[in-house]
């Protein structure tokens, strides 16, 4: 969940702002100067809410309104929605990405409304941004009298412009994400392996013989790894197939037995040895397996991976058998090939290995380049795609207090005037449609919260 220290800092910050605002407003000597300073800068303060409004961008909006106006008449697309809960399905380490991408999506959304309004000869009083507790947002102040005088079709263009601009931003971020390898080609190479950018401390991949930041993973057993997607698919494949075996000369296999005749295959606390099982040629019909305890690193280094004894028949001068680690059903022994060090040997559940490291497809061509730059660009683009697309979808829903409410009202006025001549009946139809849309959206949000928090 969200760290308590973060909540304390946020609450303390808002309390300090509110206390300072209250003291300055109650001061006889500083009240007039303070309120004049706030008004001159377009600032408004209230509990857990800061709002800033300005007219300095009106010229920019006017200029944008004259660029390719036909694009404002197109309609947007769709995106899938998922409830985001910080600390549950949103890592607290990525909150900065979330809020910056959310603010950018909100600014572009309001920019669309402002540009479309100027195209329809509606005056823009100003543009502003706000912070409500921790939620950043933006708004545009339109001249209501002008807005009410234009036709419903013109109003609909203005109300749909925010959704359209969010869709355009979503597509642009998605295109940048796909073209990122081309943009970074002079500085970063791809397709040579998955580069380790972070190792979770205390995880199975941590330690002197584990993975380190800067290592390049090139294979998991006999599954080659060229990208992060290969890493995930190889782990999935290894976890859903039989344990990989290794070709070992028959002469080096010595079955383990106790003095009393019972089998003893490695002690439970052994850190260097592992129990392997195999089938001798004379026991193939009965499928009787024998077990041998062997030093695992020495045994698997330089050996060929196999599935059956037939895989070991070719290419070996001495008779060899395919031996497999004797483990529980879901536990796997995985040999991780990475540069520039030796193999990392992993014993456990494959998902634990996947979550133990952070990887990227981009390998720096020069030593002075930062490993996290491509990761930052990738992560930020993904958040922009998700949040901008989500804003487009949510504001398209006919729901109270969202753009969908005004879009629906304008659409009904533009299409039902000749069919339903009574304005009150049209408003009643719109009310029930808004009620249904709001109920569906609220139900989806509630269901999403339940699914996220119930995991």
What are these regions (language model features)?
Residues 1-455:
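Hydrophobic transmembrane alpha-helices and their immediate loop junctions
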């Amino acid at each position: 969940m969200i760290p308590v220290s973060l909540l304390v800092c946020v609450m303390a910050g808002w309390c300090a702002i509110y206390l300072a605002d209250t003291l300055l407003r109650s001061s006889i000597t500083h009240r007039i100067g303070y309120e004049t300073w706030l008004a001159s800068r377009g600032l408004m303060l209230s509990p857990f809410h800061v709002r800033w409004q300005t007219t300095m961008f009106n010229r920019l909006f006017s200029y944008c309104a004259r660029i390719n106006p036909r694009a404002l008449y197109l309609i947007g697309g769709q995106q899938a929605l998922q409830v985001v809960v910080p600390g549950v399905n949103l890592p607290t380490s990525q909150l900065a990405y979330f809020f910056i991408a959310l603010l950018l999506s909100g600014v572009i959304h309001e920019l669309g409304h402002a540009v479309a309004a100027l195209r329809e000869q509606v005056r823009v009083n100003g543009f502003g941004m706000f912070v409500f507790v921790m939620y950043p947002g933006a708004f545009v102040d339109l001249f209501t009298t002008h807005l009410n005088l234009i036709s419903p079709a013109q109003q609909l263009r203005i109300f749909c412009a925010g959704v359209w601009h969010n869709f355009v931003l979503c597509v642009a971020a998605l295109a940048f994400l796909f073209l990122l390898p081309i943009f970074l080609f002079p500085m970063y190479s791809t397709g040579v392996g998955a580069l380790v950018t972070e190792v979770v401390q205390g995880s199975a991949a941590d330690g002197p013989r584990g993975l380190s930041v800067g290592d390049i993973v090139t294979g998991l057993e006999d599954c080659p790894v060229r990208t992060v997607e290969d890493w995930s698919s190889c782990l999935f494949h290894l976890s859903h197939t039989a344990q990989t075996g290794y070709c070992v000369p028959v002469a080096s296999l010595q079955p383990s037995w106790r003095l009393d005749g019972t089998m003893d295959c490695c002690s439970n606390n052994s850190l260097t040895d592992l129990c392997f099982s195999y089938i001798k040629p004379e026991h193939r019909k009965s499928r009787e397996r024998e077990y041998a305890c062997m030093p695992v690193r020495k045994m698997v280094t330089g050996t060929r991976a196999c599935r059956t004894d037939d895989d070991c028949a070719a290419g070996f001068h001495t008779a060899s058998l395919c031996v497999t680690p004797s483990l529980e059903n879901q536990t796997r022994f995985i040999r991780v090939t990475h540069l520039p060090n030796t193999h990392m040997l992993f014993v456990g559940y494959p998902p634990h290995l996947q979550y133990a490291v952070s990887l990227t497809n981009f390998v720096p061509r020069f030593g002075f380049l930062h490993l996290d730059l491509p990761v930052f660009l990738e992560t930020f683009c993904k958040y922009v795609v998700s949040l901008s697309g989500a804003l487009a979808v949510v504001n398209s829903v006919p729901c109270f207090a969202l753009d969908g409410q005004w879009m629906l009202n304008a659409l009904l006025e533009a299409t039902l005037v000749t069919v339903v001549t009574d304005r009150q009946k049209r408003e009643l139809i719109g009310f029930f449609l808004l009620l249904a849309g709001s109920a569906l959206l609220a139900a989806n949000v509630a269901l999403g919260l339940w699914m996220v928090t119930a995991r």
